[in-house]
Amino acid sequence: MNNNVCHPSYYTQGKYEVIDFLEGHYFPFCLANAIKYICRAGLKDPTKEVEDLEKAKWYLERFIKNPKVFKQSLYLTKRSQVYWEEDDNGIERISAEDFTADKFGSTLFGDNFPNRSKAIILITSSMHAPDVLESYLDIQGAIKCVDAEIDEVLDRIDGRSK
């Protein structure tokens, strides 16, 4: 298969491929899709950057919309993580901080930490939170970051500056 099928450039920017990050954390479907859209926003089709971010937000909102699905997804993800950590499966777990620094050129210690990075770090944190409420709050925080990113992109498109 060609690279547009197996390794499209909009997912392989930098050292880490998006799918490798997602597999290493066993994200549920909606969260994996949200991260995918955050990472590819503006890269697959520059004219659809806002649309990709809106899709990411839609997946995050859908994930927390149904409490039963939300709780079950968190439970199954935690069970998968425990199982695979006990069995050496050879899948590298890339930290959210390393992944976002690679994708967006940011660091935890810099003042210019993009909303996309914050959203991905919060989504990842939600999968490791000690309880459902903290997971929910992390996802709510990620939604706010995506909203802020959408505003920044619209400002840039409209030529507005803050």
Regions found by a protein language model. Give the residues of each.
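Intrinsically disordered, low-complexity regulatory regions
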Residues: 1-162
